[in-house]
Regions:
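Trp-centered recognition loops
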Residues: 27-31, 39, 60-77
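A mid-sequence, solvent-exposed acidic-amphipathic segment
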Residues: 44-68, 80
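Extracellular beta-strand ligand-recognition surfaces/modules
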Residues: 67-105
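Extracellular/luminal beta-rich ligand-recognition
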Residues: 1-53
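Short beta-strand-to-coil "C-cap" segments at the C-terminal boundary of structured domains/repeats
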Residues: 2, 114-123
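Extracellular beta-strand elements of beta-rich domains used
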Residues: 95, 110-117
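Short, surface-exposed beta-strand/loop "edge" segments at domain boundaries and coil↔beta transitions
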Residues: 4-8, 103-108
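A cross-kingdom marker for long, charged
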Residues: 123-133
Length: 133
């Protein structure tokens, strides 16, 4: 999500010129990361170890979730942002999809289809349908 000066702490406002000099003016101000696995329960969130308080990781699937099958997902990004950071988000700046085997030495393959932003996350999740109208 874009950096929002009006929502930034004093310290964040002091640091921002350095962040922009090192990483660019469009460097996100807040980051939500949805992950499969981890030690927390599904739905729980925790501070992103790479971004500190500016990022939140949210567990979507537990270790041991069946492989080789489609897993429809729907999230309420707006509410997750509010829960994580305490204020309303502006429109997202970037969407990234990736996978990481956490240095396990394994090879993995995954696919994504029907990625979309909808007015309501509950409509597609309840039917398992990954298409949007």
């Amino acid at each position: 999500f874009p950096w929002q000066r009006n929502k930034a702490s004093f310290g964040e406002r002091l640091q921002r010129p350095l962040v922009e000099a090192l990483k660019g003016r469009d460097t996100p101000g807040r980051i939500l990361t949805y992950v499969w696995g981890g030690g927390a329960a599904v739905g729980e969130g925790f501070e992103n170890p790479y971004t500190g308080k500016y990022g939140r990781m949210i567990i979507r699937k537990a270790p041991g979730t069946p492989l080789n099958t489609w897993h429809p997902e729907a999230v309420n990004v707006r509410q997750d942002f509010i829960d994580a950071f305490g204020f309303e988000p502006v429109d997202p700046l970037y969407i990234a999809v990736g996978s990481d085997s956490d240095d396990t030495g394994v090879m993995l393959r995954s696919s994504v289809r029907g990625l979309a932003f909808c007015a309501s996350a509950s409509a597609n999740a309840s039917t398992g349908d990954d298409t949007t109208n």
